[in-house]
Amino acid sequence: VTMRDADGWVVDFTDFEALEDACLFENPFQLVQERVSVHRENLAIGQATETAKLDQFWLMQRSRPKLRAATSLLERVIAVPETSEHLLFRFLPSASVFSGSLFAIARSDFTTFGVLSSSIHETWCEAQGNRLGAGNQGRYNATRTFATFPFPEGLTPDILAADYGHDPRAQAIAAAAERLNELRENW
């Protein structure tokens, strides 16, 4: 989240669960076969084979279907690292593949971004979250911090941003958040 976008690709055959369909993409399939299959075989030593997903090596081990469904109609999502010295939210393309150390929040509006970037949310996270690692870094926990955070009344994540777009509080938060995002992106 704190670095510029990586110049890399992820081969994702989620929409091609059948081996016959996936192997039609010859070069990407060969790459996955050479690298992922061997990696999973090494992981499977001492584990149940279904855990390593050996029989479907071309598929993501955890494809996160709920996240994909929640973000499918969005151009971008709000992302936050699980552990970091500073609490930092950033917009990322919804087509990104999110690792286990990065939380994706299925919202694309500046109001939610602003509320999450606020000092109030940061204080809440410090009180609700825990610490991890040698540097005693804060750990963002979606269940303990995001799900329990008392969003401002009428600006909660279960309400569509368009439904509170006329609210002066939402407009002020969104304007400040948009400026914050612009400054961060241009830094």
Segments (PLM) and residue ranges:
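S-adenosyl-L-methionine
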Residues: 1-187
